[in-house]
Amino acid sequence: MALVQKTEHQSHISRNVHALFIRNGRVHPLHPFKMNCSVYNSELTVYSKESTIMSERATAPTTAPAATSAPVASATSAASAENLPEPNAKLTTREKKWIVYDVGNSAFVMLSTAVVPIYANSLLQSAGQSNIVSTWGYAQTIASLIIAVMMPVLGSMADVQGMKVKFFTGFFLTGVVACCAMALPLSWLIFLVVCILATVGLNGSLTFYDSMLVDITSNERMDRVSSHGFAWGYIGSTIPFIACIALIFGGPSLFGWSTVACTRASFVITALWWVAFTIPLLTSYKQVHYRATAGQTGEAIRGTFAELGSTFRAIRKNKPLWMFMIAFFFYIDAVNTVISMSTSYGTQLGIDSTHLVMALLITQFVAFPSAIAYGKLAGRFGAKTMITTAVIAYICIVLFAAFFLRSATEFWILAILVGLFQGGIQALSRSYYGKIIPKNRANEYYGFYDIFGKTASIIGTFLVATTTSLTGNASVGVLSIAILLIVALIFLLLQRDPTRK
């Protein structure tokens, strides 16, 4: 169906209505927002049927029914409609400062994929633990479960004006502090707990970071900007990673430190890199789309709990969105499981840690141009088409890992294949979702996006860990990932793409 665009006349009406009912900084009791009336939310993408309902409510008399359970008003900063660049224009300063956070946090993602599992493996072996894959998998499952429970509620709260950056900062600091704490001499159990905290901090910050995308760019540029974020994250993270690897392997001879001490120092280096590339975003970000509070902030936050159910029902009623969410649930499960379990899987197969680390480094270099290329291809063929292509490719990758991966050479091949599609499917999923949700409720919707992704991660890592434990064969656990991808492919093929006419 045709998309609804806000006209100049509608903008004029919205400004006049807003000015009429707000006096001395307070919202009048008869403000249309207090009566559950939607007044032309800026850049809100809806279907024609839904827009008709919105229009009827916007013109309803002031004797409309009573207020909703959540005393909040939809609002959009005036900056949202100003100075928007052309779709093919160069990246703006605001977009670049958003992108560099991917450079910062990806350093920890890289470290937690390549170095942390190996270090945890040494702690587990020293403590007499044998099943590395299942133990690490259960730790990742716990972290995913915590995020899945927290994010919808916190995401809804963060849609209130000024709250998004506060929640983002809180989770970012949690991740950084936990990353530094990993450098302490800890037992294997305490180390896993700290790893869980660091993972929660990372993924929590990413939920709010992803939702910032709707504030810093337009629909037409989302695929491109999101792809650049992942691309520069991949290539940028190699700088601290190479420094850490050089320290781990060269530190003992250069400085006389033990390998363990050098590994712990790499955690601190990564945390400092993460902080450095977060500062530009923290000092420049402005929340454009938000729900302005009607009364006290605490009152509005309490109202968000009542809105969670209605938001989920709205997602269910929007069939294209719901179909995509189900598909996303299954395919991102597979992608995240491959990322989090690859090093442990290689270790279980007896592949040397040097080969594991270097192969994962190759993944980063391959993913950089691939993610940018995916963004360009999405502009030509559509984001959904490219996502579907990546899902098919991942099915082939999983089959290769399960049946043919037995040596370091094959692990290198796997790393290259993953690099070709990993960044593209992640970037386009983030931007495609941002196009089909209400912008001024982005955090709330991205909270559900995150719960689908993190709940899926629980299933994926738990499935691999449990299957490996029961069969004693890690390859069987990896093979189970293909089932999830096939289910995702079916739903993608059945979904109608709302972004294309």
Regions found by a protein language model. Give the residues of each.
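Juxtamembrane intracellular "pre-TM" segments in multi-pass secondary transporters
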Residues: 80-95, 286-325
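Helix-loop junctions at membrane interfaces in 12-TM secondary transporters
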Residues: 183-194, 403-414
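Intracellular juxtamembrane helix-capping segments at the cytosolic ends
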Residues: 204-217, 424-437
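A membrane-interface helix-boundary motif in multi-pass transporters
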Residues: 248-272, 466-485
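Multi-pass alpha-helical transporter architecture, strongest
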Residues: 273-284, 479-501
